[in-house]
Amino acid sequence: MKRKKLFARGLIIVTAVCMALASVACKKDVPHEEKPQNTVTKGSAWFTENGRSDYKIVVSSEARDEITFAKEELIYFVEQIADCKLETVSDRFAAYDEKSTYISLGRNELFEKTDIDLSAANVGNSGYVIQSVGNTVFITGDGAYDYGTIFGVYEFLKYTFGMEIYATDCITYNAEKNVKMPVFDVKERPDTDRFYFEGARTDYIGATRLGMINVTSFCASMAQGHSLTGILKMSSDYVGKDWLTAQDQLCFSASEMYPVFAKNLIRIIDENPDASRFFLGNSDAVTQCTCNRCIAMKEEYHTNSAGLMMIFFNHVLDTVCAYTDAHYPDRGIEFSTYAYEGVFEPPVKSDGNGGYIPDSEAVIPHKRLKIMFTPLLINNMYTLDEVPNKANFESLIGWASVASEIEMYGYNYYTRSTTVTSGTFNTFSDTIRRLKDAGCTYYYEEGPTRGENFVQLKLYVQSKLCKDTTLSYDETAYDFIEHYYGPAAGAMKKFYQLFKNYYASNRENMPGVCQTPISSIYSVKFLQENFLNTQISLLEEANCAIEDLKTEDRQAYETYLWRIREEEFPARVNRLQVYSSSMSATKIKEEVEKIRNWPNSLPNGSKYEAPGSQLGVVVKYDTYFTNLLK
């Protein structure tokens, strides 16, 4: 069976080059549990045959945008893989019996005629059921939004055509045009109910194809992030009152403020009918109220500032949820707040047996309030149970012991403004497993906006691990490298292992938290010269590995070249940042011109740019390069 690779939505298709996995000396991740297997067996009915299909897609006549997107993705990929364009029919006009040949997407009239029980399947917000009933296949997600149906479509394509999405511009599948429809009995709930990795590569299509859901896209702008003060100030009721500190932080003990805040929050909900997520975060980088009422309230409930905030939310959300349940029972409205600066420590105490109990019944978070744990000082060079992170992790466990739902706001640390990658290669798999065990249902990572190493690899690998925490980080990374770099995979695996080993053996010298000063990152202690030189040497080896493609397959050559350069850019920039003072003027000029000329250096003026290409960072660094040449 031939294996094909889809390089971009522009539909440049080339034959994939199969390569053996290079043996690498490393400690493998050890899965901590086994997962039950779903049942997918061979069917007898043809799905696609000689460019045609008897199957039609059925969607509701009132389908949400997510169902429309799922339908478009199914049509798109089947047409590209099997040269067969599927037709769509509304559920109002789909005559249904056991012999019908339909692919039903989401909840619709056909689905309601089945015995499929989504509640019993318990698939969460991003899980799905793929179920054969007769010749018809039902792909259905649950939750207020239909992302599960989208993800179910990708899983259907994986089972049917062997399709795997490594990146928006790297999708593999089995090149078979005549395929029989499998018989499905699949119920899938990802280990992390929802996750999202922020960054330059996570446009809607790219993120969705990797299984991400960005819950901030469901938010009303007035109730997103650090929103409490803004919500209170929507009306003038606060004027002349002592409800705010001098720094505009709410005074949570001001009980007369509670109904005013609830009224304003209800107004936001009314005015934003498409929003379902409402973040209720206190002001950023501002101390908590220390008035006499707050001090007295803490003493009364034997609690801390976070406890006062929970008391405030409990009163407000009792009012708001009674309103939303009556007026918007089907909107799936949810609320969350940050466990962050000033309210980071949970309102709990030891139970004497290694666990935690709430400071009082009054501080137990409202059952509709999600706690988004937001630790600024987590060090990604260490696992959560190691000394640098242990206190933070205990705080997470404390929150998880009292909250109905816990979420995680992570940081891709210093990479938002540098070309230095974070060291999650050795720790992410442990982190996501511990978060799963703690009951974490959402993982959000504030990520890179510029050109660090391994952006696309991390998006793929970490997305896979969020869905299935039993996977090995290394094995998943090697699989990505194999397909993403083709003939250069051997060199790129060594490049990946270089980083893993270096970060593991030098972690005590390496800054791992998001507030690390830039001067500490671009340092001889952190970025040793031999480490940078070895990076560039391995990337030159990767370039040599694709040289034959210049004449054999020009488009494949340009694709692989650009992907290698996306790794070479930070390597060369980091070397200039730290060691330019010891370079000759000639060497500096050579290095700068090499980088500056990359966008135009391909012969015949041809150019290939991957979505969100980090080579665009050349513009950001142009002033820096100019100053170096002076």
Please give the residue ranges for each predicted region:
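Bacterial N-terminal signal peptides that target proteins for export
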Residues: 2-14
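C-terminal motif of bacterial Sec signal peptides marking the signal peptidase cleavage site
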Residues: 22-25
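Acidic, contiguous N-terminal accessory segments
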Residues: 27-129, 171, 177-188
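Feature activates predominantly on carbohydrate-active enzymes
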Residues: 54, 65, 70-73, 77-79, ...
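Structured mid-domain segments that build the active-site/substrate or prosthetic-cofactor binding neighborhood
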Residues: 249-259, 267, 390-490, 494, ...
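Aromatic-lined carbohydrate-recognition surfaces of secreted/lumenal glycan-active proteins
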Residues: 313-349, 406-413, 443-446
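Substrate-binding cleft/loops of secretory-pathway carbohydrate-active enzymes
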Residues: 335-375, 419-424, 452-459
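Catalytic domains of carbohydrate-active enzymes that cleave complex glycans
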Residues: 465-630
